[in-house]
């Protein structure tokens, strides 16, 4: 069995902390929350400390933050219905663009693998795709409305310009750009959860997706492409996503976030029961019927709901979490 070892407990935000995001280099992270501020943290020696506080970009709670793949830009999604784009081009972080268009709270933001596209989603049930048109210029490329309820999360595929979204309507949607007319279309709807889908994340090569839900389960989905050896039908030559594994019984309340480590293959969950749990694929797992087992858990990882977990993209086994209790924690996971 593995271990979840607490390395650092950090404070600074006032109120609940909604999101944390590692910089691509893994030596810096950003956090955001109820206090309308973004904090940029870095490691000096063995001490994490706040280097910058960005407090003038939003008028309400900041729900999520994400670094661009190049690490030069930071996007923040807020309940004030805007998304802010920050950069450090002048030496200090500045808000260089504010993206407007959503009618209600923006819940999530995500950069594509190239950094050339940005996706946002909102309580207004829509998903927006933005093109980075140049220096600090963003153009709306698509407004997508296939969900029937609040959209909780958007995540780009790690190797292709494919977008996944998760919603209060219990579904996950996949989007891709049609090569002929350049229109963005919903290419797949993933149904199996029986309540809100809070979080989604791709594995390292993007052939599988993990989702977590209010129904207290996590599910593993696999992509079946046209001509697949499993014999799964692919109507209209479109990739089909099938639920190949459901992990249940470990969580007692809603699972708010899930992160699939691109370095180790481990899956971490953030739960409303204050716990963090780590799952590993079994050694005898089959591609079309994989099995995942819980290798370690910290039942009282935080004093209140755990809102976000994210694996460090560079340091294998390092995990960050944040909570309604106003703390950020950095963990070391051993197998």
Curated annotation (Swiss-Prot):
Post-translational modification (record): Conjugated to URM1, a ubiquitin-like protein.
InterPro entries per record: CIAO1/Cia1, G-protein_beta_WD-40_rep, WD40/YVTN_repeat-like_dom_sf, WD40_repeat_CS, WD40_repeat_dom_sf, WD40_rpt
WD repeats: 12-51, 57-96, 101-140, 146-185, 192-231, 250-289, 301-335
Record-linked Gene3D superfamilies: YVTN repeat-like/Quinoprotein amine dehydrogenase (2.130.10.10)
GO CC terms of this entry: cytosolic [4Fe-4S] assembly targeting complex; metallochaperone complex
Tagged with keyword Ubl conjugation: yes
Biological process according to GO: iron-sulfur cluster assembly; protein maturation
One Pfam family here: WD40
Entry keyword set: Repeat, Ubl conjugation, WD repeat
Protein function: Essential component of the cytosolic iron-sulfur (Fe/S) protein assembly machinery. Required for the maturation of extramitochondrial Fe/S proteins.
PANTHER family: CYTOSOLIC IRON-SULFUR PROTEIN ASSEMBLY PROTEIN CIAO1-RELATED, WD40 PROTEIN CIAO1
Similarity comment text for this entry: Belongs to the WD repeat CIA1 family.
This protein's name: Probable cytosolic iron-sulfur protein assembly protein Ciao1
Organism of origin: Drosophila melanogaster
Lineage: Eukaryota, Metazoa, Ecdysozoa, Arthropoda, Hexapoda
